[in-house]
Every structure is written in structure tokens, then in C-alpha cells.
Design a protein with these regions (language model features):
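Active-site clefts of carbohydrate-active enzymes
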Residues: 346-354, 409-417, 511-526, 559, ...
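Polysaccharide-binding and catalytic clefts of secreted carbohydrate-active enzymes
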Residues: 295, 305-306, 313, 319-360, ...
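Short carbohydrate-recognition loop motifs
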Residues: 46-67
Length: 715
């Protein structure tokens, strides 16, 4: 989820202008009657629509697994004769729509692989699973043209560009040539039979050469002057600007003299347990459990919040009609709330609201208020993606996300670089130099090398993926050399084991594979993939320690442990970090056993749709009371484990209703975009955060709650 490579921001901000024309040139329409005719149930069929003013396919499946087959092999149109899959959609519910576009291939030569999903579930590929899919979101109760660029079937990019009213789109799976598609399914959600039941109107499906034109503007805006959703009421919704100012001022006054508990040291460590202080954070195992040790020597468990900074912006191009008010470019009062990024306008209602509350001195007031609120809620760490100026000024321990992890001009698969090239080494040296400004700061807990490598989203055999194209690379050359040494220069043995007819090892350079030539080839590719990952990790780890010997290497914040390859890096980190979404932390004991290192959770959250926003985030609960219980359950069950030394909640501020840069619009904040804390959540956070050391040492029993499983609304 989360804020993946920041360099993607501008590309994702480029909202694609879309719309519908009756049947212009370059549009191949699907047969909607044929699609509808595949279904016998009464919940799916063609009906007259008041929204689209024509017959549409009405979809309200009786269970969450039923999908709409929009194309099967032999149908028209042809996937290779267009650039975009476009479908017109309207979701009737008062929460975001979730659609999964699933592309299937012929699996007759299928090789089974293990897959671990971001929510922590383990599954396996089988012949009934899509080969590649894209999970997409749409705003509720708005006609939307959903656009999927067919170029993304190569699986090299995870996040599709947004179009108006279309939210985030995330690709998962393996590359697929258009001519190999045998079936395409649209699967709608969320669904659980009681609280959530998907209900949609599907007006058209087509393959197009170019992006369609926009819909006409709506007559009634859906977002008010404060950035709030107009069409829904909820407890705590602000009436107007005066209400917002009054509540913010009352909160600031209530917490102006707050501090940490007396048994906490200046860094937030626990005075009741002391080790040797070194002036910087470090790790220690006391014979029973792992600890961080703060610079003064006190035992320290990191309980933090990600994305602490005064921002919650999103792009508005092509969606101006959704807003009751937008600050204009050049408006001096709200200049800091409006950004022009390469011609695309982004608006931040959170900053606009802080300007309304505090005037032009809003930033210094925000710094003071936020520091006090963090201490009031008993957070002792400023988490990833946060404003570093705020972190250093607040004198609260912080973690540092390093920028610009080394890449190369040639990418082997997604963002995996050519690790055997000298270019990778030189870029790693430049990457490490940014630590020079932080190496003497005792408040820095440590640094993350990067966040959620895209090559690690799902199970992928990296060496095999290199051979999807004839692209030359130093790593491919090294693989061929390695293979020749492994088989002692005997190409006949390779030909027999791989089912090939190569004349020599060098001719492997010109080979491409859509499928594994044999099980032995699969194993050989995987064996070399472990070498690739070792190089990927070792080279930057060698360089950062040359610049900064004082601080901990906190790892790469893997999105989840999608394959065995990710364990290989653990020995180079001081702390092994993963992002773990669930009602409890993901399994961590095996990580500690295999890496010999303690574990830190870089991100987790739980969200609901009972208040300000129409999506829950990666883990959903029914309401704010259950968000509170879920936080307590996650943190206390986590710190009861001897290997966990830190957990950071994602994130400080709610995301904007209209979607951040990539389209996420989740109710996951500690505070709203009007800077009002969620009382149920913050009270629970305060209670649990004060107990972490007693829970970790077994003095009190960890809080436990039976939280009902709820479909997550995320994309």
C-alpha cells in the first residue's frame, strides 16, 4: 500500500481524461447481450438504467466469488488490436466499488508455485486462477469509465494510471501476451451477505485505440469546502469552518502541557530495564526476548505512526466538478495547499484547513500540536514517510526512509536492477552518501534501505523473468557463465535436462521463455535468483555502513514475505522489517529464527466506512469501536512475542475522499483531514501504548479481542 517508489507520483498524478462516445472509430465494443446471456440467475441481467438512460447489465451476485465473464476465446474483439480496456460502471452502494479484472491463459504446461498474498493468506497457483489481474477501485454513486491500459499485461508495472472517479489500480500476477488470453472476468465486491453486497450497473465494455473523452460535469458537487463527503452524515462531521476552528483550538488547549509517563526516559525507553548505553539505538537479546536499546541504555520498544506530516493531497484534474470549492492557482492565502506538478493540479484540504484554523503561521502551530498529540497518545517513534524536519525538531525518535535505492538503466524484472553491473555499484555508493547528514543524530533509530520492492510482490523467479525478452544485461551474462560452470561446460547435459537444442551456452542469450522448459530449468533459475538477491542486498549494505556506523539498518520493509528469496537478506540487516496487514501481526517467529534478527512491522492498519470515507484500507472492520479494539489487539498481541521490537501504524491523517496520488482513499487516519482525532481510536491507542513494556515482560496479559472478519475495501 502504501507509498511505494516516490518517483511514480508524477506518473500517477497524470489523470487520464476519459469519457464515452457512441461508437467512434478505434472502439471495439463487446456484445453486452451475449455477456448477459451467460447467466441464468435473477440477480444478473439487462435492465433499463436511470443513470445511463439505456439498457445496462445489472450485476448483484449472490456470493462474493461470482464473476462476470466478459470475453472467452473466439469472442470479438481482438485484444491485440487496441490499447485500452474501457468499461462504463456505476456502483450503487455508499462505499467505494471494488473490481478485479482477471485474465486467464491456457495452463496445460502449468508449473505450480506458492503465492503469499498481502493480507497474509497463503495459497497456490492452480489451473483455475487468473494468470494476471488488476484490482481497481471507483468512487461510489458516480458514473465512471474504468480504464486498464493493455500494456500492463506485461506485469512490469504494478500501479495503473488513474482516470477521473477511478481510484487505485494494482496489478498482480505474471506477464501475459494478448494472443494467449483465453478468458477475461470482471469480479465485483465487496460482499459478505449482510453488511456489504455489491450492486453495479455495467453499461458498456470495449477495447479502444485511445483514451475516451470525459463525461459531462455533474450538477451537484459531492465534496464540501472542508474536503468532507457531502452525501453522507456521521457522528463528528463538522458543520462548517467555525466548527472546525473551535474544535481544533479546544484540542490544542487540552494537550498543551502533555509529556511522556514518568517511567519513560527522554527517548521513550523504559527506565525499569536498563542495558549499556552507547549514545545510539541498538539491539539486544536479554536471554528471553529481543529489545531495542535507546541511547541512554533503556529498553526500548518502538511504537510509532507513519506519514506524520501536514499533508493529505490528491490530484483533481478531470474531477473539478466533484468539488464545492477548490483553491485557485495563484491564490496567496492557500498557496501551500495547491501544487502544480508538471501541469497536473493537486489540492490538499488538510493544509487548507490548517490555514483556516491558524492563519499563515499554521506550520509552527501544527508542529507544536502534533508533537503534543503524539506524546498524549504515547507514541515514541515518528514512523516512515514522515516529515523529517518535524521529526528532528520534535526530539522524538524517528526512522529514516532512504531515498533513491540504486537502480540501473536496464531493469531485469519490474524494479529489479542489473545487479552485476558496475552501474549498480556506483549508484549504491551515491545512495549511501545521504546518510552523512544523519550519522551523528542520537534520535534516529535507524534507516530503511527502501520500501516494498515491486519485484517481491508475489512469487517470481527472477532469473527466469530475465528471459522473457532478449534484453542484454550483465546479470544475464553472469547467469550463463554460472550455468556453464554448474554443468562443467557440457551443453548436451543442459539440453537434456532443459528440453532444449542449444549448440552452445552463448546461444542461450538469444532464448526467450514463456514457460519453464523443464522442472530442472525452474530449479536452476531459482538457484541463481538467490544469488541475484544476495547481490541486490549486499552491495548497498556494504556501502551504507561505510558512511554511517552508528545507526541500525532496518531492512527493506517488504510488503509481505511472498517467497523464500526474501529471507536471504536477513543476515545483513540489524532488524528485519516487513509490512504486516491483519488483525494480528503476521507470523514473525520464523523470520527471527532464520535471520537471527529481531523483527519490526513497518506498516499496519484497520479501517471502517462508518464515518468520513468510503474505503477501509487493506484490513477492514465494521466501525470505529472495532478500529479501536483492532489496534489494541494487534499491538499487544505483537509485543507479547519475544522477537517483535517495533510496530508502526499507517497512517497519521486520513486519505482524501477523492484519492491521494495513486488513488487510495482509506479511513486509516488517527486524525481526519480536518485534524480532528478519532476519539475511540486515540483512547485505545493511549491505553495500549502505555502498557507495551508491561505486556512485553509478561507483567500484564496482552489484550485480546474477537473481531469479526469484514471484507476489506481496498485496491
Amino acid at each position: 500500500m502504501k507509498k511505494n517508489v516516490l518517483g511514480l507520483v508524477v506518473g500517477l498524478l497524470g489523470l487520464l481524461t476519459v469519457a464515452c462516445n457512441p461508437q467512434p472509430e478505434g472502439v471495439q465494443s463487446f456484445d453486452m447481450q451475449k455477456i448477459a446471456g451467460r447467466y441464468a440467475d435473477t440477480e444478473t441481467g439487462m435492465k433499463q438504467s436511470d443513470i445511463f438512460k439505456k439498457n445496462v447489465l445489472y450485476v448483484s451476485p449472490e456470493d462474493g466469488s461470482k464473476g462476470v465473464v466478459i470475453w472467452e476465446k473466439g469472442d470479438k474483439p481482438v485484444w491485440s488490436q487496441g490499447n485500452y480496456l474501457v468499461f462504463e460502471l456505476y456502483g450503487e452502494a455508499q462505499y467505494s466499488g471494488v473490481i478485479n479484472i482477471e485474465f486467464y491463459k491456457d495452463m496445460k504446461n502449468f508449473v505450480a508455485e506458492k503465492i503469499v498474498l498481502q493480507g497474509g493468506e497463503t495459497s497456490g497457483t492452480d489451473k483455475d486462477m487468473p494468470w494476471i489481474s488488476c484490482l481497481m477501485g471507483v468512487l461510489p454513486q458516480l458514473k465512471t469509465q474504468v480504464v486498464f491500459p493493455l500494456s500492463y499485461l506485461d506485469a512490469q508495472q504494478l500501479f495503473v494510471p488513474r482516470s477521473p472517479r477511478q481510484l487505485k489500480g494494482t496489478v498482480s500476477g505474471n506477464r501475459l501476451a494478448p494472443e494467449d488470453i483465453i478468458k477475461v472476468v470482471l469480479r465485483f465486491g465487496p460482499y459478505d451477505g449482510s453488511n456489504y453486497r455489491a450492486s453495479y450497473e455495467l453499461a458498456s465494455v470495449s477495447i479502444t485505440d485511445s483514451l475516451p473523452d470525459p463525461y459531462p460535469a455533474i450538477s451537484t458537487p459531492v465534496i464540501d469546502r472542508l474536503g468532507q463527503w457531502k452525501d453522507k452524515e456521521w457522528p463528528g462531521k463538522l458543520k462548517d469552518e467555525e466548527d472546525m476552528i473551535r474544535q481544533n483550538q479546544a484540542i490544542a488547549k487540552e494537550i498543551e502541557n502533555v509529556g511522556y509517563p514518568s517511567e519513560w526516559g527522554r527517548f521513550g525507553g523504559w527506565k525499569k530495564k536498563q542495558f549499556k548505553g552507547t549514545g545510539f539505538f541498538r539491539t539486544q537479546h536479554d536471554g528471553t526476548r529481543w529489545w531495542l536499546v535507546d541511547p541512554d541504555g533503556y529498553a526500548f520498544l518502538s511504537v510509532g505512526i507513519d506519514c506524520i506530516g501536514p499533508n493529505s493531497s490528491g490530484p483533481v484534474n478531470g474531477m473539478e466538478d466533484l468539488f464545492e470549492w477548490l483553491p485557485e492557482n495563484g491564490n496567496a492565502t492557500y498557496a501551500e495547499a495547491v501544487k502544480d506538478r508538471r501541469g497536473f493540479k493537486t489540492v490538499d484540504f488538510y493544509i487548507a484547513n490548517m490555514i483556516r484554523v491558524y492563519g499563515q503561521d499554521w506550520r509552527s502551530q501544527w508542529d507544536k500540536l502534533t508533537e503534543n498529540l503524539m506524546k498524549k497518545i504515547r507514541f515514541n517513534t515518528v514512523g516512515n514517510w514522515s516529515d523529517i524536519d518535524f521529526a528532528r525538531k520534535s526530539r522524538i525518535p524517528y526512522v529514516l526512509p532512504l531515498r533513491d535505492f540504486p537502480g540501473t538503466a536496464v531493469s531485469l524484472y519490474r524494479d529489479f536492477p542489473d545487479v552485476f553491473s558496475d552501474e549498480y555499484l556506483q549508484n549504491a555508493k551515491a545512495f549511501a552518501r545521504q546518510l552523512a547528514d544523519y550519522k551523528d543524530d542520537p534520535y534516529m533509530v535507524g534507516y530503511f534501505l527502501r520500501n516494498e520492492p515491486q519485484w517481491a510482490f508475489g512469487y517470481h523467479n527472477l532469473a527466469y523473468e530475465m528471459f522473457a525478452t532478449r534484453q542484454a544485461s550483465h546479470t544475464k551474462d553472469e547467469f550463463i557463465n554460472w550455468l556453464e560452470k554448474k554443468y562443467q561446460g557440457d551443453i548436451t547435459v543442459v539440453n537434456k535436462k532443459w528440453n532444449l537444442k542449444l549448440k552452445d551456452f552463448a546461444s542461450l542469450k538469444d532464448c526467450t521463455f514463456k514457460e519453464y522448459p523443464s522442472d530442472v530449468a525452474n530449479d536452476d533459475f531459482y538457484e541463481f535468483s538467490t544469488i541475484m538477491v544476495k547481490m541486490y542486498v549486499d552491495i548497498p549494505c556494504d556501502e551504507v555502513v561505510k558512511i554511517d556506523k552508528n545507526h541500525m539498518n532496518l531492512g527493506m520493509r517488504y510488503a509481505w514475505l511472498s517467497s523464500d528469496l526474501l529471507y536471504k537478506a536477513g543476515e545483513r540487516f540489524d532488524v528485519f522489517s516487513i509490512n504486516g496487514y491483519g488483525l494480528v501481526p503476521p507470523p514473525t517467529s520464523e523470520i527471527a529464527e532464520r535471520s537471527g534478527k529481531p523483527v519490526m512491522i513497518g506498516e499496519f492498519h484497520q479501517g471502517a466506512v462508518d464515518r468520513a470515507l468510503p474505503a477501509t484500507g487493506i484490513i477492514g472492520v465494521l466501525n470505529q469501536q472495532e478500529r479501536a479494539a483492532a489496534y489494541r489487539n494487534y499491538i499487544e498481541q505483537g509485543f507479547a512475542r519475544p522477537e517483535l521490537v517495533g510496530m508502526h501504524y499507517f497512517q497519521w491523517i486520513d486519505q482524501p475522499y477523492y484519492g491521494r496520488f495513486d488513488g487510495e482513499n482509506y479511513n486509516i487516519g488517527v486524525v481526519t483531514t480536518c485534524n480532528i482525532p478519532y476519539p475511540e481510536l486515540t483512547e485505545a491507542m493511549t491505553t495500549t501504548n502505555e502498557r507495551i513494556y508491561d505486556v512485553a515482560t509478561g507483567k500484564v496479559e496482552a489484550y485480546s479481542a474477537d473481531i469479526p472478519k469484514t471484507p476489506a475495501i481496498h485496491y
